[in-house]
């Protein structure tokens, strides 16, 4: 009897050891990972590798942790240990993160843009030397406006045409150094509160051709999240982006065991079984040792499983968990496919070039099919894969590349361009030319930017080509002289009235009785100050001293402050900036080709075939024509 008890005990110990040494995920294609615990890898009764098969340093690979002590001070010790541990146990290591507006070295704040860029380059180069074969990288973290966009983003190109050029640059830099790594954009509140902003950001950098391979949803917002809301948001994001997804920082922060279990049981299968989900990383697992209140997201407490952990062990042994598909079989990236149009906004009627960057890790490309709006346009068989498309309709056009390898495997990538109508342009060269009330646009000299009106009737900069887009309200202005004003002190100055594009009466933004007895009817399209200057009187920017400087452009000085306008902020500068006042076909579109200063010699198709004389414009069918070298739209 005593011998039987001993044998039974040995059997139990053996069974326990076997259970403990088995990682929770038995799926060969997607991982269930975790992070370090207060700088330690193994923590608690079970070793890290006995539970998880992917690791992310909680802090050890953040720039501040590595180089926060000074430009010449590098501390790679913690990250080295984690990287080596992952290689020892043959599972993925994720570098978290290269570019983030939090936990970066604060000495960066004191550098010029040029030196900031040099520091970023050195940071990435050094990380590349240390970890040349890293499998995954959070290239940019939490850049949604209001989160933590990098304060040093101007060093990477600033907002630019996409609004996120600096992020595109960061991904290009990462891809140059780690072409085989899975490059990820990572952010929070993606399932609640910031879903649309997340989609907008990732869509714009994807469409700009950034070499982004996946998006990371941190998922801290899932505590208390309604299941329907979660499912709908996850589907909405995927339908918009059509890219691999990582659940990158999952936790359910609650002291209540039943609540934590409920959300684990509801949410984990949804994300894990989605074939576009490449893996799930929990953001800590030891109770009291996570970033949440009292560490209450931990699923092992005092060495024992909380109910959520017990369930997680059981779920990971099910066939559904074991057989769930992944966009990265074997947890590695086979295909790098990116679609890069020459610009996100292109003129109607002009050919736009599209570069399809395609590279396989082990396979061979047979051909690349290029689609526009789901219609096959070209089949490309040789690199470089360059396509061309001439949009003939205004609006958004969806681009898609489908790469087929010699074994028949297909890989897809989306992008898009927006086509606009280019009405042509003629810059005015004196105030006399704009005193007759004709509409004009205001563009910044030397910049591809134009003034426009936001929803709050304030001004800012938009892409210059949008000034030619009649569908966007608020790009056109009229100049109104105050020569007949009862206030003799302002008779040599001007009001700027902003027009609506449907020819509705332009009105004054202000209250009745203000603006030197000008009529007002409430909220309307009227340019007074710029951005947050509500023009209820002269000091708030209602009246401008406008001068034309030969060969340079127009200057705008607010007569209340005596300071000049430069940008989308108030007029606050001692020195003038220069602007073009230019005609762009009128507020209601082009009716006849009168934007040129000399008589057109004829009207041609886009293919160069002459179809009419200049005075026969009205006989032509609607379309896009070349008139004196410019594209003109006839409606």
Language-model segment annotations:
Residues 75-89, 160-183, 193-259, 268-272, ...:
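Glycoside hydrolase catalytic-domain groove-lining segments
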Residues 23-58:
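Boundary/entry segment of secreted carbohydrate-active catalytic domains
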Residues 50-68, 77-192, 254-256:
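Substrate-binding cleft and catalytic face of glycoside hydrolase catalytic domains
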Residues 33-46, 63-77, 104, 144-148, ...:
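Acidic-and-aromatic substrate-binding clefts and catalytic sites of carbohydrate-active enzymes
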Residues 329-425:
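Long, low-complexity serine/threonine/glycine- and acidic-rich segments characteristic of extracellular
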Residues 423-586:
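Lectin-like carbohydrate-binding module/patch detector with strong preference for beta-trefoil
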Residues 67, 126, 138, 142-160, ...:
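Aromatic-rich peripheral "rim/lid" segments of glycoside hydrolase catalytic domains that contact
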Residues 367-372, 589-635:
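C-terminal outer-membrane/trafficking sorting elements
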